[in-house]
Curated annotation (Swiss-Prot):
The gene is outK. This is Type II secretion system protein K. The chain crosses the membrane at residues 8-28. NCBIfam families: T2SS_GspK. Cleaved by prepilin peptidase. InterPro entries: GspK, GspK_central_sf, Pilin-like, T2SSK_SAM-like_1st, T2SSK_SAM-like_2nd. It comes from Pectobacterium carotovorum subsp. carotovorum.
Amino acid sequence: MRSRQRGAALLVVLLILALMVTIAAVITERTGKAFLRTESHLSRQQAKWYALGAETLSGQILQRDARNMPGRTFAGQNWSQPGLRFPVDGGEITGQISDARTCFNVNAINQGVDNESTLVKTPYPAQVFRLLLKNLGEETDRAEKITAAVRDWIDADNYPSANGAEDDVYAALPVPYRTANQRMSEISELRSVYGIDSDLYRRLLPYVCALPVDAMSININTLTEFDAPLLSAVFLNEMTMSQAKALVQQRPRMGWASLEVLQQTGLLPPNSKNTAQRVLAVKSEWFFVKLQVRVGDSDFHQRSLLHLSGQKVQVVQRQYGGYRTVNP
């Protein structure tokens, strides 16, 4: 009898011990996970503050360059240095400032250069966008349809233009949605426009942007040879892409001081004076700041849009996480 009691007691002790070990293991696991979550959260918060500091520094660099050379913005200034890296406690910041006047602003597509687009059947910016598509390999018919669809996406009405697409087209899709009928707040919206697939989006992405203004302006002093398809389209393809590359190659090291100086070079197409004066610029006021911060094992991405007005820099937009992604 006593032997059985001892066996039962031993079994109870073993069960209690097993239960205690299980509870201890669960507590240890949960504590470890909580610690990792806390550590990850703290690293992300630290990385965010580093990014905001780098953003402020970027604005100061732009201000300094503007003070040193108030009349122009050109490749070779401090802001344009590629692959900037800054070591910080526990990690590293990498960043790049880019001129937002080296891309086609899709929000200008419905506007004439002087906001008189309502008087024009096909506004000049829409012609530029259509020719940019052609320069990137699109057929004329598809380029016209996509241009019309982008115009309908942004315009305020629900009346489709010729070859365009409004709510009725999007409502018939397998996953229906509606047009924005307002400015694009981010260039990734372009992927939602009818007719723009992932392949075209990838090809367009380096040449387009979405700025919070309706004006179209291209800084001739910061374009690269890669931007030849856009520069050619700006002159309605009266300038070939080879000529556009040659124009960039012959640009002075500190850029052109004014459009008048550029026009005197003879590098522009004949009868292009009006286009140059209305669209081209030698100075920029919009800049993208792309930042990546690594703290420990955490990566933090931030993309900011800065507006430089005189000596004042304003942060107009911030995006955290991934940016300029391509959906399937």
